[in-house]
């Protein structure tokens, strides 16, 4: 039975996304994003959205602003 809901990826998909986020690249280029999406069985839009949210979460945990700004701000 699938636990997949309209609200987001399954546990297995999140595992793939987390692995890529932590071990491969926090800022995947379009080609890498496409490969990660294919591996996780998600659309590129869903994958990109997940990475964006995950990056904001990571930046907050590191004590950084959730959005990228220049160092001079």
Curated annotation (Swiss-Prot):
- The Swiss-Prot or TrEMBL record marks DNA binding at 3-62
Q: Which GO terms describe its molecular function?
A: DNA binding; histone deacetylase regulator activity
Q: What is its main location?
A: nucleus
Where does this polypeptide localize?
Nucleus; Cytoplasm
Query: Key word RNA-binding present in the record?
Result: no
Instruction: Offer a single GO CC term for the protein.
Output: nucleus
Keyword annotations for this protein, in alphabetical order, are: Cytoplasm, Developmental protein, Homeobox, Nucleus, Repressor, Transcription, Transcription regulation
Tell me which Pfam families the record gives. Answer: Homeodomain (PF00046)
SUPFAM superfamilies referenced in this protein's UniProt entry, alphabetically = Homeodomain-like
GO BP term, example: heart development
| Physiological role | Atypical homeodomain protein which does not bind DNA and is required to modulate cardiac growth and development. Acts via its interaction with SRF, thereby modulating the expression of SRF-dependent cardiac-specific genes and cardiac development. Prevents SRF-dependent transcription either by inhibiting SRF binding to DNA or by recruiting histone deacetylase (HDAC) proteins that prevent transcription by SRF. Overexpression causes cardiac hypertrophy. Acts as a co-chaperone for HSPA1A and HSPA1B chaperone proteins and assists in chaperone-mediated protein refolding.
Q: Matching PANTHER family, A to Z?
A: HOMEODOMAIN-ONLY PROTEIN
Q: What is this protein called?
A: Homeodomain-only protein
